[in-house]
Curated annotation (Swiss-Prot):
Record-linked InterPro entries: HSP9_HSP12
Composition-biased stretches (Basic and acidic residues): 1-17
Keywords assigned by UniProt, alphabetized: Stress response
Organism field: Candida albicans (strain WO-1)
Stimuli inducing this protein: By temperature-induced mass conversion from opaque to white colonies. WH11 is abruptly activated at the second cell doubling.
Family stated for the protein in its record: To yeast HSP12/GLP1 and S.pombe hsp9.
Domain of life: Eukaryota
Ranges of compositional bias, category Polar residues: 18-27
UniProt region (Disordered), positions on chain: 1-32
Pfam families: HSP9_HSP12
Protein name: White colony protein WHS11
Amino acid sequence: MSDLGRKDIGDKIESKLTPDSQKSTPEQFKDKVTDSLDSAAGKATSENDKSFVQKASDAIFGDSK
């Protein structure tokens, strides 16, 4: 199993819990870029190759195929 290219679940949670109004412009940009890359990596990885944590993260944050 590999989580290569995936955003850490803790980072995802922190990003979602912090309102954009409390983030700097570079932080907002970083979140958008890393969220997009994580979503693409999740869609490119088969369910059999995902760890339990990534499967749960995809289900919670809507990044599953």
